[in-house]
A protein has these predicted regions:
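Gly/Ser-rich catalytic/binding loops embedded in alpha/beta enzyme cores
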Residues: 1-156, 274
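Short, well-ordered beta-strand elements within core beta-sheets of diverse protein domains
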Residues: 1-6, 75-79, 192-199, 324-331, ...
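Acyltransferase
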Residues: 11-16, 43, 229-230, 257-282, ...
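Glycine-rich, small-residue loops and helix-cap segments
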Residues: 18, 53, 59, 93, ...
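Short helix-loop capping/hinge segments that flank enzyme active sites or metal/cofactor-binding pockets
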Residues: 51-71, 238-247, 295-348, 409-419
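Glycine/threonine-rich flexible loop motifs
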Residues: 69-78, 256-257, 373-380
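Short glycine/serine-rich loop segments
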Residues: 83-85, 89-215, 401-414, 418-421
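A short helix-breaking turn/cap at a secondary-structure junction
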Residues: 173-261, 445-459
Length: 459
């Protein structure tokens, strides 16, 4: 951005370089390019805006009017968006970003591996045989691989934090409602939030400066908060003394011991550098979601597919097909009420964990139970040699979605060249404090900004 303002490089030149990188990339991070409109936008970009002239990727679950809106699913491959997501509209119109194209996602955003029948396999720029995660896998791969500086993401169960952890990026899951889900916001999506994947804490803060704030089309969206970027580095006194629980197995998760040993060291450093107060013995237990979490996702998928199911089942990715088949018997009001009861149980438990008097201010855990797994899948069932089941892959992240908390994944080192992420979860409305903590990590444990795109295992 500064190079644009100094006249050293133009947005048009940057966009041309982005498209050249996409054409040459082995990552399969993009599934639709809008060269014509992006070229026009780059030519007239206002470089004084926060992201003026900067090409970005747009996750394919977002909407851009006139672009495909397949939700990464073959049965919807001919759908075209008639509106534009509020986040995308704001980052384009208020932020000045240039929409280069659409990044790949897992089908319906329902799996944390970005591999679909429609678009094929998206690969991790740190090792091409590994996944960037999901569902915002294409966005994470594109940013970590140096193709674009930023890309949109969404997080309904970890879909920003999981790929952020796998790809060595900053991934902020904001408080529920921070960024409007419009157009077409609906009460069935009470866990999902909008955001971005970025290499730096400052870019994330600047992004939210642009996109946050109420939209009447989403009645659950929050009022605007100013000063995200300006506040960076000014909140050290506010974070000092915050009570923190370090919980490697949050949500009954199984975590790789080797990975956690490294993350525990990063957690200790953060606690020391920020002056946090570690609290042991606080009950951080959560009710087991069991089948309820899978059923809740399948209900949404069933609503989107409508009469196409079950005739379309052979066109679906294995995990989505299996989820639909396994949960087809519970698509009724009584079963959905049981799901909501389970959500309420989790809400009560989370409220106790973060109780202002008897609880903690922060929970530190991992972003993922292990390093990135095979790009083609399947979802792993063992983690550092310990059995955990396929459902273990999202256990660390979904509690913040169910309760609506703010949470962030921060790059915290690597295991054999594969990035690992430290997840910090706070109360609602604590995003500035989480960004302050991430800034401390960024300054004291700087991470590589762009991954070396390599094939197979590191030498």
């Amino acid at each position: 951005m500064e190079a644009f303002r100094r006249g050293e490089r133009s947005p048009a030149e940057e966009l041309e370089a982005v498209y050249a990188a996409i054409d040459a990339s082995p990552l399969n991070a993009f599934c639709h390019l809008d060269r014509e409109h992006a070229t026009i936008a780059a030519g007239v970009a206002d470089v004084s805006l926060p992201f003026g002239g900067v090409p970005i990727g747009v996750k394919e679950l977002d909407q851009v009017a006139g672009w495909p809106h397949s939700l990464a699913s073959v049965p919807l491959r001919d759908e075209i968006a008639t509106g534009t997501s509020t986040q995308v509209q704001r980052i384009r119109d208020l932020g000045g970003a240039v929409l280069a194209g659409q990044t790949t996602s897992s089908e319906f955003g329902g799996v944390n591996v970005t591999r679909t029948v429609l678009h094929g396999v998206t690969r991790n720029p740190w090792r091409l045989d590994r996944t960037p995660g999901g569902s915002s896998g294409g966005s994470a791969a594109a940013v970590a691989g140096g193709i674009v500086t930023l890309a949109t993401g969404s997080d309904g169960g970890g879909s920003i934090r999981i790929p952020g952890g796998f790809c060595g990026l900053v991934g902020l899951k904001a408080t529920f409602g921070r960024v409007p889900m419009s157009p077409n916001a609906h009460y069935g999506s009470l866990t999902a939030v909008q955001g971005c994947l970025a290499r730096s804490v400052r870019d994330v803060a600047r992004w939210f400066d642009v996109v946050n704030g109420h939209d009447p089309r989403d009645p659950l969206s929050l009022l605007r908060v100013e000063g995200w970027e300006a506040g960076l580095g000014t909140l050290t006194d506010q974070v000092r003394g915050m009570r923190v629980a370090v919980v490697p197995d949050w949500g009954d998760a199984v975590v790789s011991p080797e990975m956690w040993d490294l993350l525990a060291g990063a957690a200790d450093e953060l606690i020391r550098d920020a002056g946090l107060a570690r609290v042991d013995g606080v009950d951080t237990g959560l009710p087991r979601m069991g089948r309820a979490w899978a059923v809740s996702g399948s209900v949404g998928t069933a609503a989107v597919l409508g009469d196409r199911w079950p005739a379309c089942k052979d066109d679906l990715t294995p995990e989505i097909r299996a989820s639909m088949e396994n949960n087809a018997d519970v698509y009724d009001a009584h079963s959905y009420a049981l799901i909501e009861r389970k959500r309420m149980e989790v809400n009560e438990a989370m409220a106790m964990i973060f109780d202002p008097v008897d609880g903690v201010d922060l929970v530190i855990t991992a972003s993922n139970p292990d390093v990135a797994f095979a790009a083609e899948g399947p979802l792993p069932k063992t983690f550092g040699g310990i059995k955990g089941g396929a459902g273990n892959n999202g256990k660390l992240t979904f509690p913040a979605n169910l309760h609506g908390n703010a949470a962030i994944s921060i790059p915290a080192g690597d295991v054999d060249g594969l990035p690992i992420g430290l997840q910090v979860v706070g109360r609602h409305h604590t995003e500035p404090l989480l960004l302050e903590l991430a800034l401390l990590v960024e300054r004291n444990r700087p991470w590589p900004l762009i991954a070396p795109v390599v094939q197979g295992a590191p030498s």
